């Protein structure tokens, strides 16, 4: 018998959460269907992103981890969703496997420049996933490695500043007490400059 993943789902009529159980396949199909809807809205501008290349759904302890990878004419939009104790949904999208730090853990969306104009739709996707799975909040920031000066996110007692300098991504941990920081050199960003 196939193991099922437990999650809470909000009932609008009853105004309460109910515990649901779905198979790994059903949960995966829900996520991919949601992503397909989002990408369908983008296809007029970026081509027809109708190829689902890879997918997986895994459970690690109390954390449910779902990953879908969509290819559009050779350009990849990798989307990962992690459900932390059903309290929040964090989604990361990044280009061509570029992974700067653990953006999933600190709640960031890494978006290819071609998709930035559709960022509001992607936020709706995250909120919808959070709502369906009974999460109390969704966490996200939208970053473009060639068009932002500074991004801020408060996380785990630190102010994390993501800084783009000379095509490199840096992570600064600012301690709130004395404002000292540690700068860590990230991976080179080769995303095209907009405009």
Q: Where do the protein language model's features map onto the residues?
A:
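Conserved acetyl-CoA-binding loop of GNAT-fold acetyltransferases
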Residues: 153-163
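A conserved beta-strand-loop-helix scaffold within acyl/acetyltransferase catalytic domains
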Residues: 71-100
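A short, internal acetyl-CoA/4′-phosphopantetheine-binding micro-motif in the GNAT/acyltransferase core
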Residues: 107-117
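Short amphipathic alpha-helix that is part of the acyltransferase structural core
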Residues: 2-70
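C-terminal "cap" of GNAT-fold acetyltransferases
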Residues: 164-195
